[in-house]
């Protein structure tokens, strides 16, 4: 399948098949101010970095994509599967500084326009949801815990229209070079999707897991047509020139920002 994320300055821009008022993308690590290691475009306030750097990067992205910072919403992610509906009242949450608002949220959706849903990533899977006909957009953060917790199915529980009208984009995340131990593998085998389709055993206590594929399988099992699910080829762990990777860089790294908004 043709790659739909097109590289632009500071971010990957998702190319839709049809004309749309939706903007969907994922930032890269290039050409910023942050020390990860140098001149990196870090988008997270919750790691060791200057607040000025983050605000400057936000301003740059805001100008590039046409969504001012006061229209952004950012939750405090905790690798859980809690979902919240956001409205215009949430605009600006956790953008200038982090607060207790939207704490413990790893999935958001809205039917309001002129809101940019944002979350940070550095190997975990960004899962974008949208329906042009229903004025709906959503964003989920699915690391191994969120995937095991079936956060994508929690997102679907909030969708009150036919899944034929729902499109899913699975964005840049770690490849199956990401390895889990026996205990985590056993957890995934509890799920009703076929673990052999996304887990590759490489020896005792070493198993490669394809989290992008796992989330796609969960969505399909829940009834989303496979034709409505797009999976990017971009891998955070295999493209360190473009992306931060928490696992490869042993936690000493920045974060990318996934975003989706509707005018």
UniProtKB/Swiss-Prot annotation:
Zn(2+) binds at residues 79, 124, 141. Belongs to the purine nucleoside phosphorylase YfiH/LACC1 family. The keyword Nucleus does not apply. Purine nucleoside enzyme that catalyzes the phosphorolysis of adenosine and inosine nucleosides, yielding D-ribose 1-phosphate and the respective free bases, adenine and hypoxanthine. Also catalyzes the phosphorolysis of S-methyl-5'-thioadenosine into adenine and S-methyl-5-thio-alpha-D-ribose 1-phosphate. Also has adenosine deaminase activity. Homodimer. Keywords: Copper, Hydrolase, Metal-binding, Oxidoreductase, Transferase, Zinc. Pfam families: Cu-oxidase_4 (PF02578). The keyword Ubl conjugation does not apply. This is Purine nucleoside phosphorylase SERP0752. Its cofactor is Cu(2+); Zn(2+). It comes from the Bacteria. GO terms for molecular function: adenosine deaminase activity; copper ion binding; oxidoreductase activity; S-methyl-5-thioadenosine phosphorylase activity.
